[in-house]
Amino acid sequence: MENEFTYEDYQRTAEWLRSHTKHRPQVAVICGSGLGGLTAKLTQPQAFDYNEIPNFPQSTVQGHAGRLVFGFLNGRSCVMMQGRFHMYEGYSLSKVTFPVRVFHLLGVDTLVVTNAAGGLNPKFEVGDIMLIRDHINLPGFCGQNPLRGPNDERFGVRFPAMSDAYDRDMRQKAFNAWKQMGEQRELQEGTYIMSAGPTFETVAESCLLRMLGADAVGMSTVPEVIVARHCGLRVFGFSLITNKVVMDYNNLEKASHQEVLEAGKAAAQKLEQFVSILMESIPPRERAN
């Protein structure tokens, strides 16, 4: 499906937000399933329910509160999505990624994407954090790309490169932040693969995804990253490993959304500290609003 939004639609939403808040964010953070507690770390917070904001879709999944929260985190002006949108909710990719282009028009230059993911890499354990080094856009192989349709040069070029989608310098700074935290558990790094959902993977599918080189699998993130890079935003992402993907027919365990939420809750404090420290390493704003 081609983009149902015009440039003016994005502008109207950005102008509505500008007129309702004095915050001028530099960093946008998309909070994944069960990770919305990051917003509690913001100072001078100001929140809007998605249903207040023109053109914004609505979150329908447990663990996604459906609020846009502005504030400051470690000296950086931020806007956080307390809940994202997914293909499996029935949303087009232009709706899934709508907020990212609005953030760009608000002056955001850095996007931090977080998600809950299943671990495909046998070395990963539940509770691990994996920095996203690269991604595999599985829906993209079937023509589901958020940039499909006429290109708007005001956002970016027709054929954007994705070989450097995740900022290398930010990943290195993330490793430094992890050391600063004194965590005993190793900080992981790997490739995230997106499936459309809402079903979890079969054993055969899981084995195939691992053969493709994926370390973690989830149902989000990639469309937002593609649109962010199209707009020229710096992108940093990480996955919280909330379950180990079943890759053996003799394994009777089953993935569930409840365990995803519980793993997010258990790791909340660690994640909040990690993102907070990481904010210090984001370069100052390069362009004025």
Curated annotation (Swiss-Prot):
Highest taxon listed in the record's lineage: Eukaryota
UniProt-listed SUPFAM superfamilies: Purine and uridine phosphorylases (SSF53167)
Broad class of the protein's primary localization: cytoplasm
UniProt site (Important for substrate specificity): 243
Molecular function GO terms recorded: guanosine phosphorylase activity; identical protein binding; nucleoside binding; phosphate ion binding; purine nucleobase binding; purine-nucleoside phosphorylase activity
Record EC number: 2.4.2.1
Record keywords, A-Z: Acetylation, Cytoplasm, Glycosyltransferase, Purine salvage, Transferase
Gene Ontology BP terms: allantoin metabolic process; dAMP catabolic process; deoxyadenosine catabolic process; deoxyinosine catabolic process; immune response; IMP catabolic process; inosine catabolic process; nicotinamide riboside catabolic process
Subcellular location: Cytoplasm
A Pfam family this chain is assigned to: PNP_UDP_1
Disulfide bonds: none
Any GO CC annotation of this UniProt entry: cytoplasm
Residues that bind a purine D-ribonucleoside: 88, 201, 219, 243, 257
Catalysed reactions, as listed in the record: inosine + phosphate = alpha-D-ribose 1-phosphate + hypoxanthine; guanosine + phosphate = alpha-D-ribose 1-phosphate + guanine; 2'-deoxyguanosine + phosphate = 2-deoxy-alpha-D-ribose 1-phosphate + guanine; 2'-deoxyinosine + phosphate = 2-deoxy-alpha-D-ribose 1-phosphate + hypoxanthine
Pathway: Purine metabolism; purine nucleoside salvage
InterPro entries: Nucleoside_phosphorylase_d (IPR000845), Nucleoside_phosphorylase_sf (IPR035994), Pur_Nuc_Pase_Ino/Guo-sp (IPR011270), Purine_phosphorylase (IPR011268), Purine_phosphorylase-2_CS (IPR018099)
Residues annotated with N-acetylmethionine modification: 1
Binding site for phosphate: 33, 64, 84-86, 116, 220
PROSITE patterns cross-referenced by the UniProt entry: PNP_MTAP_2
Biological role: Catalyzes the phosphorolytic breakdown of the N-glycosidic bond in the beta-(deoxy)ribonucleoside molecules, with the formation of the corresponding free purine bases and pentose-1-phosphate. Preferentially acts on 6-oxopurine nucleosides including inosine and guanosine.
Self-association state and partner proteins as the record states: Homotrimer.
NCBIfam families for this protein: PNPH, PNPH-PUNA-XAPA, PRK08202.1
Similarity comment: Belongs to the PNP/MTAP phosphorylase family.
Protein name per the record: Purine nucleoside phosphorylase
Recorded name of the encoding gene: Pnp
